[in-house]
Each structure stands twice: as C-alpha cells, then as structure tokens.
Amino acid sequence: MLQNDGQNKEAINPSWAYLRLPPFPHVALRVLQLASNENVQLHELSDLISSDPAFASEVLTIANSLLYAPRFPASSIQQAIAVLGANNLHGLCLTVGVRAYMGKNLNQPCMRAVWRHNLACALIADQLASVGSLDRDVAYTAGVMHDIGRLALAVVRPREYCLLLGAHSGSPVSILKAERDLFGWDHCEVGRQLITDWKMPPEFEPIVAEHHQPRQKDDPWSLPALINVSCRMADTAGCPAFAGCEITPYPDLLDELPERERGLFHATVETLSAEIARKIDSVETA
C-alpha cells in the first residue's frame, strides 16, 4: 500500500504518470469538497450544480427516480435540495459524477458490472447505517467512493481491464495482485492517491485504501468496517464487480454485523437483492 508521507507520487511509483487517469467531473468534486464546510449555504450548492446544465439535468433525473422516491417531484435544483436535503445531495451528485466519469464505457457489460457493484455497495451501506448509529449520508458517499480506483483503471484502460476481470476468479482481494501486475498499481492504491490528487475529504482515504480488509473480531464497528461488509454483500446480492468473484455466504456476512444491525437488516439475501436491483435499475433507466 502507498504511504501518505508526502513523497512525490512519481517517486513512490514511476508508473503513476503513465496511467494518465482522467479528471473526475469538476462539479461533483466541488460539491463533495463543500460538504465538509459547515458554513456552506444552500444557494452556493444550487448555483454550483446549476452552472453545468447537463450535470444539473442528470441530478434532477436521478433525484426523481426510485433511488430517492420523493413524495413530490422536483423541477429545479432548489426544489431537489428542499425535498432531499443538502446531505442527500452530496451522495446524489457523486453518483451522477461516477456515471459521467464512466461515460460510454457503461455500454460494455464488464463496465456495467463494475458500476452496479459500486452503486450496490453504496445503497447497502446507506441501509446498514440507517439501522445503526453511523451517518447515512457519509456511509452512502463512502460506498460510492470505495472503488473509485477501480473505476479510474477501468476508464483509462477499458479493454485491458475487462480482459483482466473476465479472466480472473477468486476473492475480491486476490484481484489486487493481478492489477499490480498489469498497471503497476492496484485499485486500492490508485483510489488512495486520487483522494489526494482530487482534493477529496481525507477521512475517506482509509476507506478507499483498505475496504478489502475485514474487521477483526475485537475491533469496534466503524465506517471502514461497514464498507467492507457492504462491498461483500453487494457481491452476494447479485452485483459482483467481476463474474468470477468469490461470494461470501449471506449468513456469514450477517454474523459480522453488530447485534442491532443484524436484528434490523434484511433477513434473507433475496429481499436485499430485490430491493437493490430495483433501485439500480431505476437509475440506469432514468
């Protein structure tokens, strides 16, 4: 793993410059950066989103989808903020940003699987947080961001990455070595570096870098632990990042949850799968 010690990234790994990773949509990044500012005004968020008409249109479309299921459809960004709240808007804009970042690559089945896994992880993280004590908006946002390194590798080298995913089988962790062999970096390392390069909130760095590391038995329940379980639940619920992904049995995943979350969460993988699929489908057809 990379060490966040202030070294020049090219000095850490000379292949970083070679990757030539494309920038993330500016508006989505700015919304996420503003989210950490307690003094931000709602009109600032509205003006920022509205400054990019295509982005604003996509935000409104998804805001009115089954993903958020508002009681009253929003016809403007101001209304969307009023209906959904500023906190939900952060995760929504990041979701729109990820979809825009992948662009036409989403037409490829392997890329669509990566996208669906990412969104499934975010939705599961949101649900787990809703029955526990962690912040739902932060959990959803962390879920969307957890595989940002994988998304970046997929976008910059789509053909090679699809071939890698198609040929690989094993645990989600085992693919990291295959990525390092091909790119010089794995998606956790790339994600950690992008948190810095894109000036994202630094508290997401350990989540992005360590989301494949399961919680130890005596460790407290935390956001990184929630994302780790959510990521594997996404695989089990029918949204694996690659076809040969090793699946953890759902009862085993439930056993990893704290008592409160375990008692209030979906008792069967079938009910979880149906709900997640319905919400993702609503975004894809929006």
Language model segments and positions:
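Conserved alpha-helical "signature site"
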Residues: M1-S169, V173-T248, T285
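Terminal helices and disordered tails flanking the catalytic cores of nucleotide-processing hydrolases
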Residues: M1-I12, D218, L253-A286
